[in-house]
């Protein structure tokens, strides 16, 4: 039996599909990320704790190659001095893909906590209660409620809500191993201390502590008020199976194992694969 001439159209179409697939796979890369916003500051005058910055993390994010992705690291909120409520932290972002809100402000005497990535804690007051701030959906937890008898609340954290008045503890942090080491970040600030509120650690996105009713240097005579604590600045961490071809902003590079490349941004910058 004679052999018919084979058509090359099927081979041609298969080659086109293969080339198209190569173009798609060579133009994208799949990464893991951790993006944390800046923490809110604590309120003064029996203030509530600041909320932690929004906390977003996941693997399997497909991003474009051959373009620079802008990294923004949110600043932690400054303290309000010895009067008034705290301030909201600034948001952090990874290109156009992921944004994490800044943490909510801690309330000053008699004031409610502010909304944010995690909510700020309500302040204490002489009578009645104050409400905690509301967290951004999927990014954190609510702040606690302040109570009468001057009992302030903790700010929300990535891992839990802030405790209600009783000079409540801040909400728990959340732990990540994206760098190859287990590190806890984004805890809520505690309610008022005995004097000034504690400042949060840089690049953790944690909230600042609430200020007490007596300033640190005024003794027990009621002169002055303790300020709230600063919020911690945020952080953006990218883990990829390939080395970046270009970065700006001097990120810390970590190579925990073969084909695992981690870039830790503690300040603004960019990354290109």
Residue ranges and their predicted role:
Residues 2-14, 19, 30-273:
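Low-complexity, glycine/proline-biased repetitive segments and flexible coils/loops
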Residues 20-24:
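Large eukaryotic, non-enzymatic subunits of multiprotein complexes that serve as scaffolds/tethers
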């Amino acid at each position: 039996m004679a052999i018919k001439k084979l058509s090359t159209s099927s081979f041609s179409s298969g080659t086109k599909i293969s080339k198209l697939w190569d173009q798609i796979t060579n133009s994208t890369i799949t990464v893991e990320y951790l993006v944390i916003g800046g923490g809110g500051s604590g309120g003064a005058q029996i203030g509530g704790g600041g909320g932690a910055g929004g906390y977003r993390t996941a693997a399997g994010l497909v991003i474009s190659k051959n373009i620079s992705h802008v990294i923004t690291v949110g600043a932690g909120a400054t303290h309000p001095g010895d009067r008034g409520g705290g301030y909201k932290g600034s948001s952090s972002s990874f290109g156009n893909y992921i944004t994490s809100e800044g943490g909510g402000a801690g309330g000053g005497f008699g004031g409610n906590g502010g909304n944010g990535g995690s909510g700020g804690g309500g302040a204490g007051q002489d009578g009645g209660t104050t409400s905690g701030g509301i967290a951004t959906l999927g990014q954190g937890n609510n702040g606690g409620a302040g109570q009468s008898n001057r009992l302030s609340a903790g700010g929300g954290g990535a891992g839990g809500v802030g405790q209600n008045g009783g000079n409540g503890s801040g909400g728990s942090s959340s732990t990540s191993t994206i760098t190859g080491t287990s590190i806890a970040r984004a805890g809520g600030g505690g309610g008022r201390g005995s004097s000034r509120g504690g400042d949060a650690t840089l690049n953790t996105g944690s909230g600042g502590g609430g200020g007490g009713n007596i300033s640190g240097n005024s003794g027990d005579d009621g002169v002055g008020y303790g300020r709230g604590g600063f919020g911690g600045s945020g952080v953006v961490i990218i883990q990829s199976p390939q080395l970046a071809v270009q970065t700006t902003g001097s990120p810390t590079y970590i190579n925990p194992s073969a084909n695992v490349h981690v870039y830790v941004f503690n300040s603004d910058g960019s990354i290109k694969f």
